[in-house]
Amino acid sequence: MSIPNLGKKIIVTVPSTTANLGPGFDCLGAALDLYNEFIFTRIEGDGDRFDLIMESTDGNHLRGGPENLVFRAAQKVWESADVSPFALEARVKLAVPPARGLGSSATAIVAGLIGANAIMNSPLPKEKLLELAIDIEGHPDNVVPSLLGGLCLTARSSSQRWRIIRCDWHDSIKAVIAIPAIRLSTSEARRVMPKNIPISDAVTNMGALTLLLNGLKTGNDELIKEGMFDKLHEPYRWKLIKGGLEVKEAALQAGALGCAISGAGPSILALCKSNNGKVVSQAMVKAWENLGIASRAPFLNVQTKGSQFKTISGK
């Protein structure tokens, strides 16, 4: 396979994600219409050269150099396609804040895979990119919806194959994501979880997940209220999020159908009907404000197209 011409440029747009949604720990996630944009350009130099240029209005940043997730993902593509690495520049426009539970790491992984693949005229199929993305991230709940879009349930089957189910999301159900000006790493959020759980907690979560998925499919308020409940991770993680339970209670009092930690946190997801999203958003921001924490709570739609790319110069 030939190395792309100097100057070839690919633009990749990757949606943010909210994972778990309460009971769907490490298997359920939805893509949202908040995006990071990555522009990849073939530049002069060998495969060890990877230039990362970030544009952000709020001080967010990604780690540069060979350890960067974008570069690591690109390397996986080169290895899988059996090609020699080549020099790349990645210009990143950040809108998805890192360490907030919105899948910023997943956007970097997915962008690196798609960008490196597309700049070589896409030798790897999407199924292979999904496999690589899950391998790099270590769990599927962010990278799968980030790549495919929509609400995705991903599980490893008895044959050890990843099975992905695209689940329905009723048009009447909207998402409010309260994003505080504090950070929480996924590794820290995982450290507080127990290594073993009671069987009763596992059974509770299986039932809750079934109720939630049916509620999201049909738009049934009661099923969403009863299904957005977790016993596996949230009881241990709420204590890491200052004011988290107060924000959750404020959202529910304002009419939210359900509330959960978005991914590993600290952002908080509230599901609501479209006619009361503004009230829920204001209540969540106010609850954090009362504790001296700045936040914003955008009203977001589920993004169904997943990651997109286009060639803007070169062949």
Swiss-Prot record:
Compartments reported by the entry: Cytoplasm
GO biological process terms held by the UniProt record: threonine biosynthetic process
Record's keyword annotation contains Nucleotide-binding: yes
Enzyme class (EC, first level): transferase
Enzymatic reactions: L-homoserine + ATP = O-phospho-L-homoserine + ADP + H(+)
Positions bound to ATP: 97-107
Keyword entries, A-Z: Amino-acid biosynthesis, ATP-binding, Cytoplasm, Kinase, Nucleotide-binding, Threonine biosynthesis, Transferase
EC number: 2.7.1.39
InterPro entries found in the cross-reference section: GHMP_kinase_C_dom, GHMP_kinase_C_sf, GHMP_kinase_N_dom, GHMP_knse_ATP-bd_CS, Homoserine_kinase, Ribosomal_Su5_D2-typ_SF, Ribsml_uS5_D2-typ_fold_subgr
Any GO MF annotation of the entry: ATP binding
Pathway: Amino-acid biosynthesis; L-threonine biosynthesis; L-threonine from L-aspartate: step 4/5
PROSITE patterns: GHMP_KINASES_ATP
Cellular component annotations (GO), alphabetically ordered: cytoplasm
Keyword Transferase set for record: yes
Gene3D superfamilies in the record: 3.30.230.10, GHMP kinase, C-terminal domain (3.30.70.890)
Domain of life: Bacteria
Family: Belongs to the GHMP kinase family. Homoserine kinase subfamily.
NCBIfam families: PRK01212.1-4, thrB
Stated role: Catalyzes the ATP-dependent phosphorylation of L-homoserine to L-homoserine phosphate.
Protein name: Homoserine kinase
The species this protein was found in: Prochlorococcus marinus (strain MIT 9515)
Highest classification ranks of the organism: Bacteria, Bacillati, Cyanobacteriota, Cyanophyceae, Synechococcales
